[in-house]
């Protein structure tokens, strides 16, 4: 019998705003999206701030978006959890932090703090670094070194100097800490197994290898002179007057990695924590007996201590589909595969019974503006075969392009990215409709809707604009004022399945 699948199609980084300047979503020629928008019930959803468990006004992101979508409720994000812990004094009593600090005091060794040096709030927040510096001062830790990963992606591309100056003020204020290395996140936070990048960051931190500077700001100035901005700054070493590195990571040191988002923290963490690491030769000085702390749970593969342990999410969308004996497919290209699997399942790595996954490799290019279509056509071809084969009751699909190309801050490639996705969307939705199925077309957060600032500069960060939702079923009405946490209840509603009590979101379909 022909399956009539209900598909949740996530156009990553695709939000709506009226102003067309710098707006790749508005400027793109997207006949399929426009046709569905005009023909079927539609509304807009909030995908940022408190609607997704973030601080008010904080832009959403893919991890947060998929967690909320899959959970069918507002999920309190790590950023909010840590902020509350700082505010209520719980941060200073955190046993894992205190154990790391005691470890270096007992061994007479150094504490290293590393993470993304910005207030972007997507992977980290600089205030969490300040809280760690304050705690180190309070606990009497003398040797504290900071390895700053420069952002330029979740914040403006040339904002590193302001964060470094602010950090230097805090170091002065607390009387503890020195900047030891700086590295663009392109190197230190790779997630695509481009180990040559990670190796450069590792060797700067452990061997003191790389360009050397007396002053962190001089490092940034020098990079800017060569047209290399924050995200891409080569791993660089800050040295003392005699040319020796301020600090390298050595045996018995402690590391606190203050990023809270796992995906871009895993590879560099594995480099330090895994005994059977084989991705590159770590050399004779690879530090032993490190006390390695992850701010949150990064992955089963990372052998470190976790300061803020995960909160379990029960009865996520995938689990409910599985409990009712439905077959489900998760499909995406590499860049968003963890999002439609791990994050969509509430932080669970394993598949549910009846769940299949298809991973299509993302193209190997330095930056995706060079190939705006990415692997969208390959994802589409793979999915069309599965729809034709009548195997699945539910499909969860992500198109990465509007987000990944939007991060370039380049308008033309981002328009091309949106257009490629629209072409693919048309094929997929029409195939689903031909089977008598239903598509829910939506997004997880904004990005491609604002790739230029009003004065024409690249805008590489996400946005706080609302995201669309279209349900390709005639004769229903969708309510306004919804959130991402309402999508799973809507999908269950369309499948005729009961909503579990843990899902506090509400179906968007007006009864």
Swiss-Prot record:
Gene3D superfamilies: Alkaline Phosphatase, subunit A, BPG-independent phosphoglycerate mutase, domain B. One of its GO terms (biological process) is glycolytic process. It catalyses: (2R)-2-phosphoglycerate = (2R)-3-phosphoglycerate. Mn(2+) 2 binds at residues 12, 62, 444-445. The active site is at residue 62. It holds the Pfam family iPGM_N. Binds 2 manganese ions per subunit. Keywords: Glycolysis, Isomerase, Manganese, Metal-binding, Phosphoprotein. One of its GO terms (cellular component) is cytosol. Substrate binds at residues 123, 153-154, 185, 191, 261-264, 336. Its EC number is 5.4.2.12. Mn(2+) 1 binds at residues 403, 407, 462. One of its GO terms (molecular function) is phosphoglycerate mutase activity. InterPro entries: Alkaline_phosphatase_core_sf (IPR017850), BPG-indep_PGM_N (IPR011258), Metalloenzyme (IPR006124), PGAM_B_sf (IPR036646), Pgm_bpd_ind (IPR005995). Pathway: Carbohydrate degradation; glycolysis; pyruvate from D-glyceraldehyde 3-phosphate: step 3/5. The modification Phosphotyrosine is found at residue 36. CDD domains: iPGM (cd16010). Belongs to the BPG-independent phosphoglycerate mutase family. Monomer. This is 2,3-bisphosphoglycerate-independent phosphoglycerate mutase. The gene is gpmI.
């Amino acid at each position: 019998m022909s399956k009539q699948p209900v598909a949740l199609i996530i156009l990553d980084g695709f939000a709506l705003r009226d102003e067309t300047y710098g707006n790749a979503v508005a400027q793109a020629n997207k006949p399929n999206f426009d046709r569905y928008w005009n023909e079927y019930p539609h509304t807009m959803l909030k995908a940022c701030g408190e609607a997704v468990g973030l601080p008010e006004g904080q832009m959403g992101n893919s991890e947060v978006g998929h967690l909320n979508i899959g959970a069918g409720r507002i999920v309190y994000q790590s950023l909010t959890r840590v902020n509350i812990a700082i505010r209520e004094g719980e941060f200073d009593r955190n046993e894992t932090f205190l154990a790391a600090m005691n470890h270096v005091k007992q061994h007479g060794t150094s504490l290293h703090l590393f993470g993304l040096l910005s207030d972007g709030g997507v992977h980290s927040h600089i205030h969490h670094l300040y809280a760690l510096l304050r705690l180190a001062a309070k606990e009497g830790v003398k040797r504290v070194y900071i390895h700053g990963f420069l952002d330029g992606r979740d914040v403006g591309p040339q904002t590193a100097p302001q964060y470094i100056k602010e950090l230097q003020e805090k170091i002065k204020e607390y009387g503890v800490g020195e900047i030891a290395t700086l590295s663009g996140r392109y190197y230190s936070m790779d997630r695509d197994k481009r180990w040559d990048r990670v190796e450069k960051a590792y060797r700067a931190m452990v061997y003191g290898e790389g360009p050397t500077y007396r002053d962190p700001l001089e490092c940034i100035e020098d990079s800017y002179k060569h047209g290399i901005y924050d995200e891409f700054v080569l791993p660089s070493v800050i040295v003392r007057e005699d040319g020796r590195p301020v600090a390298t990571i050595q045996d018995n040191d402690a590391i606190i990695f203050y990023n809270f988002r796992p995906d871009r923290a895993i590879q560099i963490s594995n480099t330090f924590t895994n005994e059977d690491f084989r991705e590159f030769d770590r050399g004779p000085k690879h530090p032993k007996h490190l006390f390695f702390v992850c701010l949150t749970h990064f992955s089963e593969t990372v052998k470190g201590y976790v300061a803020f342990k995960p909160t379990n999410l029960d009865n996520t969308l995938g689990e409910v589909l599985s409990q009712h004996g439905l077959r489900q497919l998760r499909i995406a290209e590499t860049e968003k595969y963890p999002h439609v699997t791990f994050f969509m399942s509430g932080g669970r790595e394993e598949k549910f019974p009846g769940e299949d996954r298809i991973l299509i490799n993302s193209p190997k290019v330095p930056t995706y503006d060079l190939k705006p279509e990415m692997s969208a056509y390959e994802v589409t071809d793979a999915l069309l075969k599965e729809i034709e084969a009548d195997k699945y009751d539910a499909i969860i699909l992500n198109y990465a392009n509007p987000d990944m190309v939007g991060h370039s801050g380049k308008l033309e490639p981002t328009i091309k990215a949106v257009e490629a996705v629209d072409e693919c969307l048309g094929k997929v939705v029409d195939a689903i409709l031909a089977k008598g199925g239903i598509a829910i077309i939506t997004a997880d957060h904004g990005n491609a809707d604002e790739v230029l600032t009003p004065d024409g500069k690249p805008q590489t960060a996400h946005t706080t604009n609302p995201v669309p939702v279209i349900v390709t079923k005639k004769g229903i009405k969708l309510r306004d004022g919804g959130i991402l946490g309402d999508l799973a209840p809507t999908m269950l509603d369309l499948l005729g399945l009961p909503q579990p009590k843990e899902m506090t979101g509400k179906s968007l379909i007006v009864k």
